[in-house]
Amino acid sequence: MELEKKEILVSEFEREETMTTTNKLKFIIPSIVGLFLFLIPLNYGGKWTIGVGILAETAQGITADYLPAFMVAVLLLSVVLTIAANVAKPQWIMNSAFLKGLFHVSGFWLVMRAAGALFAVMVIFEIGPAFIWDAYTGGTVLYELVPVLTKWFLFAGLLMPLLLEFGLMDFIGTSLRKVMRPLFRLPGRSSIDAVASWMGSGTVGVLITTKQYEEGFYTKREAAVIATNFSVASIAFSLVVISFIGLDYMFIPFYLTVIVAGLIAAIICPRIPPLSRKADTYYEGAGKQISEEVPEGKTSRQWALERAVATASKVKSVKGVATKGFQNVLDIWFGLIPLVMALGTIALIVAEYTSIFTYLSYPFVPILELLRIPEAQAAAPALLVGFADMFLPAVVGSGIESELTRFVIAAVSMTQLIYMSEIGILLLRSKIPLSLLDLVIVFFQRTIITLPIIVFMAHVFFF
């Protein structure tokens, strides 16, 4: 049902009943905790991260030795339960809307989960063709990528209701609507997705966007735009990349360049196909649930607080919130991680053992030469391998002698945003209407838009 039919238009009496001290505290306390965990930058271990990142790093130290083996078991269990749901159809799965949605999937996703489990077993036991389990393909996914995602999504999934369920999104969304709507054609609450990505992890930003879309707060177009343009690389990951290519002393100009290029791309990309052609309709299972317009006679701050407290007042039990968080984690572990293992391994095999990206990069060589980029022939493939994994451009470009070229490669890789080993798979599995072709097109659009901006800033200001 559309929001207009069920929206709480607060009368004075209803407003007094809603705006109680208890409900205000129900909004304020969880929201402050959510802000601290997801949006406030903290220096930990010599690098900037967020509260959820600190929890993930702590878990890394405790579970590093056995986490890959644990996740192999999870991947195998995912396949077994998916087969059971599609063949035997046990009542305990089929009678649960959540479990049925998680395990009763199409044949394609069943094959992908099986492939992910198979690759994981091959990697951990080092059996089968070496190109599948070596350190640069399946080994990278199982021992480096999967543990990071497992830990991040454990804490992000469990704690995300603090951001979404207690009114913080309503408060910030209404407050920032006048900025986000004219500049990016997006709701004000989309700023939360961007900041969570910026301070924490791009995958956390996508997860927030997915949940908001499925709950009726973003249209199809808005969700597609936010997921492909605002799931930015975190400050922590940017530090890793710039350090890996030997330019850590240039981090400030590097990240400034990434921000400028990323903002320009975020303004342009949503206004051209395919993103501009996505329907401005809401997810059918939820309908429209958002209302950021400020009524006459109220200030933005007053209405933001009323909307936030009204949302918080709907939370009736801790158990319900905890259940949502637990379901978030199960959905990621059993639904997404197998796909990361399968498609991530395949993408890295293509990047490491074939010349596909080299051939595809040939048109970029004259462009780089025109832009006066040294070692253009060596740099061109680095502009494209980022579609497989965001860290690959740094690996490919690390051997290039020119600091200018390495700077450009690293900055472009940070602004492309779409890479199949992680973000791409998360988007394809979500209900956001983005196809593989859409992701390919947006990846090239962002590359073409940001490359000249990054080169210009590098030439004029830094080199």
Curated annotation (Swiss-Prot):
Protein name: Uncharacterized protein BpOF4_10220
A Pfam family that the UniProt record links to this protein: Gate
Source taxon at top rank: Bacteria
